[in-house]
Structures are given as structure tokens and as C-alpha cells.
């Protein structure tokens, strides 16, 4: 999960470089890191959507400037080169298993019903944003069934139980509250950034939104197909963390340009909540280990 996450972030970085200079060298670098991301874990295939978006946008932009066959040929060569490099690197193992064992390329191991099975609970309850499970301290695969609550809790404490008595109960409440506030403001920032008339780097923000949406859709689809406690873990949504942070600070930057005092106040509050969240979360974990 961590290696795939790193390679996905590197792919987005190389994609931005490619957009600024769509040379063959940058195409090769982009294709290699994309292929490695997919090879590490099929979740890396989510990058196909933002890559497709940027490729098409770049081609259309160039076509509007220079409407001739050379432009078409140039980008056909670039897209072909990207596919010839990235697809073999990303799918060689899946194709090997398909040939040797007739295993489908997108195969997911079927798991028999166990204690952590959540398919016997209605989807409405599992997606309820106001679940009582938030009142429980930690995410447990054999007990929890609500997806939003599980994501919030596992993003802080993983799938383990830590100290929960005395002062720890207060710290836990503060940490969860900070996490909820930051999550809400992240969605507010996404909305404001995308619908603000004058917003810097809007193209890249749309690219990140594509990855954000498809990651969430893929995550929900997995939880419907594989309704188990461990399917709800935040590790399957790791890309949302840097994407959300980019939207938050891009929004704050735009607010500062229009209202310096308001922007600085929001900036201070976001940093304060993040700092409190990090300090208290690590305090709970480290003191539990000790």
C-alpha cells in the first residue's frame, strides 16, 4: 500500500512535468512510474483517469493553436509510446497469471464469511454519516460496520485498540472532532476551488479531483463487492490525504488574495487543528505502547 501510494504521487508529479513539456523523455519517465505503480498494486490503475484527462486537454490545447496533421501525429506517437511502456510494466504479472492459471486480470480473492463480514447489514446503515460507531474509540474489523466512521477512526489509529480510560477519553474526543472539522473544510475547499472564477492552477485541481472521485468510487465499489471490516480501512483512500491538503491550502491562498485577515485566520485554524490532531494521536499511541 505504501509503495503504491508513493509511486502514485510520483506519477502525478511526472504528469505535471509532462504537461509543461510533453517531450519523449518526459513521456518515458511518466510511463515507467505509471507502470510501476500499477504493477505494485492494481489500485495504481486509478491514475488512468487523471492521465487521460491531462493527455486529452494537452492535445486539444495544442490542436487549437496549430491545426495541422503534425500535431495529431506527434501526440499519437507520444500516446502510443506511453502505452507501449506502461502497459507491459503494469500488467505483465496479471497477464502471466492469466496465461498460466486462467486467473482474471482484475481477480480479487474471494473470502468466506467470517466474523468481520458486514454484508448482512443494510447499505444505508453502512453509509450513514451520523453513526453511533463514532462514539466507540477505535476501528475494529470484527465489530464495526459503518464505513464513514471506520474511515475516520482508522485514519487516526489504524485497526488497533489503544489506551481508553481517564484522560484518554478526552483526547480521543478532541482528535475525532478535529478530524471531522478538517474533513468538512476539505470538501468546502474542493467546492470553492473548482467553482471560483479566478483560481490558480485550476487544471491541476481538476486532475486531482478526478483521482479523488475515482478513488472514492473504487473504494465504495470494493466495500459493496467485499463487505468486510478490513475493506473499510483508510489505507485504501491514502491518495485523498495529499489531494485534500492541496485543495485546502490552494483555497486558503485564494482567500488571502481577497481578504488577507480572513485567509490568515483560516490558515492558522487549519494548522492549529492539524497540530492538535497529530500531537494527541501520537500521544495516545506512544503512551499505549510504553
Model-derived regions, located:
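Hydrophobic alpha-helical membrane-interfacial segments at the cytosolic entry of transmembrane helices
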Residues: 32-33, 67-94, 112-117, 208-210, ...
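Perimembrane helix-loop-helix junctions
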Residues: 14-17, 47-84, 100
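Transmembrane alpha-helix segments characteristic
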Residues: 32, 87, 198-223
Amino acid at each position: 500500500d505504501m509503495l503504491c501510494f508513493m509511486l502514485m504521487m510520483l506519477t502525478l508529479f511526472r504528469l505535471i512535468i509532462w504537461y509543461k513539456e510533453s517531450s519523449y523523455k518526459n513521456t518515458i519517465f511518466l510511463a515507467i512510474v505509471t507502470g510501476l505503480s500499477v504493477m505494485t498494486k492494481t489500485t495504481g490503475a486509478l491514475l488512468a483517469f487523471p492521465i487521460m484527462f491531462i493527455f486529452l486537454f494537452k492535445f486539444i490545447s495544442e490542436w487549437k493553436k496549430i491545426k495541422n496533421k503534425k500535431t495529431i501525429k506527434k501526440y499519437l506517437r507520444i500516446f502510443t509510446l506511453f502505452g507501449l511502456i506502461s502497459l507491459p510494466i503494469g500488467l505483465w504479472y496479471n497477464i502471466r497469471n492469466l496465461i498460466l492459471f486462467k486467473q482474471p486480470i482484475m481477480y480479487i480473492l474471494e473470502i468466506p464469511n467470517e466474523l468481520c463480514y458486514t454484508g448482512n447489514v443494510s447499505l444505508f446503515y453502512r453509509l450513514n454519516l451520523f453513526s453511533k460507531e463514532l462514539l466507540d474509540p477505535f476501528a475494529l474489523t470484527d465489530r464495526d460496520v459503518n464505513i464513514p466512521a471506520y474511515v475516520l477512526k482508522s485514519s487516526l489509529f489504524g485497526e488497533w485498540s489503544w489506551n481508553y480510560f481517564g484522560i484518554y477519553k478526552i483526547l480521543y474526543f478532541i482528535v475525532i472532532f478535529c478530524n471531522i472539522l478538517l474533513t468538512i473544510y476539505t470538501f468546502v475547499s474542493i467546492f470553492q476551488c473548482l467553482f471560483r472564477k479566478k483560481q490558480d492552477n485550476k487544471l491541476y485541481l481538476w486532475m486531482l479531483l478526478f483521482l479523488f472521485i475515482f478513488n472514492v468510487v473504487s473504494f465504495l465499489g470494493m466495500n459493496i463487492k467485499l463487505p468486510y471490516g478490513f475493506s473499510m480501512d483508510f489505507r485504501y483512500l491514502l491518495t485523498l490525504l495529499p489531494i485534500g491538503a492541496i485543495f485546502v491550502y490552494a483555497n486558503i491562498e485564494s482567500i488571502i488574495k481577497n481578504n488577507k485577515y480572513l485567509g490568515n485566520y483560516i490558515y492558522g485554524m487549519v494548522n492549529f487543528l492539524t497540530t492538535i490532531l497529530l500531537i494527541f494521536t501520537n500521544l495516545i499511541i506512544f503512551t499505549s505502547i510504553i
